[in-house]
């Protein structure tokens, strides 16, 4: 029996399928396209911080975010379903694809929200949500993004260490394939305002007006 908190190997991962999932393309909150590529001057990044319902809402509320969507990344199975991801047999984590304007929302500020609003020290879980699909992750699209992410991780780790907290387990990797989640997961908490939100930070925050 597979331990859902142990990463599956590529050899043992589910085979998936060649056909991509069809989703409604219109963002339920702001009307943007979910599938459009970033336009000139915009950037994208993939963020995993536990259940993607609450994480997506966090980011669509930030000024400077153009669009958000939720999906699966970081694993092996092509075009997985939600049920397959929850089985722990795909290797994917739940992520939010954030398209943002770095002139209005610098990546450092986006990552401030990331570090402060979940617990990045919990390994293959987030709160009561357990499994490799809930691991903390930042998947970057450029070397500049990777360097900023690593620097912000080091800065937040210093704050955690000063308060005798555990080490960060967030994986920071180049972005691989991103597979959109089913339409009912997109902007879930806007469609279901009383729905589940598992976000919960450590209580450790960057000093106000500090730079990462």
UniProtKB/Swiss-Prot annotation:
UniProt-recorded Gene Ontology molecular function terms: L-methionine-(S)-S-oxide reductase activity; peptide-methionine (S)-S-oxide reductase activity
Function field: Has an important function as a repair enzyme for proteins that have been inactivated by oxidation. Catalyzes the reversible oxidation-reduction of methionine sulfoxide in proteins to methionine.
Organism: Vibrio cholerae serotype O1 (strain ATCC 39315 / El Tor Inaba N16961)
Domain of life, per lineage: Bacteria
Name assigned to this protein: Peptide methionine sulfoxide reductase MsrA
Assigned keywords, A-Z: Oxidoreductase
Family under the similarity heading: Belongs to the MsrA Met sulfoxide reductase family.
Gene3D superfamilies listed in its UniProt record: Peptide methionine sulphoxide reductase MsrA
Pfam families: PMSR (PF01625)
Main EC class the enzyme belongs to: oxidoreductase
EC number(s) recorded for this UniProt protein: 1.8.4.11
Active site: 51
Catalytic activity: L-methionyl-[protein] + [thioredoxin]-disulfide + H2O = L-methionyl-(S)-S-oxide-[protein] + [thioredoxin]-dithiol; [thioredoxin]-disulfide + L-methionine + H2O = L-methionine (S)-S-oxide + [thioredoxin]-dithiol
Cellular-component GO terms for this entry: cytoplasm
Keyword Oxidoreductase: yes
GO biological process: cellular response to oxidative stress; protein modification process
Transmembrane segments: none
């Amino acid at each position: 029996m597979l331990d859902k908190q142990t990463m599956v190997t590529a050899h043992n991962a589910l085979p998936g399928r060649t056909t991509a999932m069809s989703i409604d393309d219109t963002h339920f909150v702001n009307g943007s396209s979910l599938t459009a590529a970033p336009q000139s001057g915009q950037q994208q990044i993939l963020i995993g911080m536990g259940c993607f319902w609450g994480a997506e809402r966090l980011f669509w509320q930030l000024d400077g975010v153009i669009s958000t969507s939720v999906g699966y990344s970081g694993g092996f199975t092509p075009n997985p379903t939600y049920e397959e991801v929850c089985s722990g047999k795909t290797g994917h984590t739940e992520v939010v694809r954030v398209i943002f304007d770095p002139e209005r929302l610098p990546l450092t500020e986006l990552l401030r929200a990331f570090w402060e609003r979940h617990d990045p020290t919990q390994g293959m879980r987030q709160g009561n949500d357990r499994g490799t699909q809930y691991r903390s992750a930042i998947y970057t699209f450029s070397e500049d993004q990777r360097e900023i992410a690593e620097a912000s991780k080091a800065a937040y780790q210093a704050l955690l260490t000063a308060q005798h907290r555990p080490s960060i387990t967030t994986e920071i990797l180049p972005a691989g394939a991103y597979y959109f989640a089913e339409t009912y997961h997109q902007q879930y908490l806007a469609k279901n305002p009383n729905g589940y939100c598992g976000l919960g930070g450590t209580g450790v925050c960057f000093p106000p007006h500090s730079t990462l």
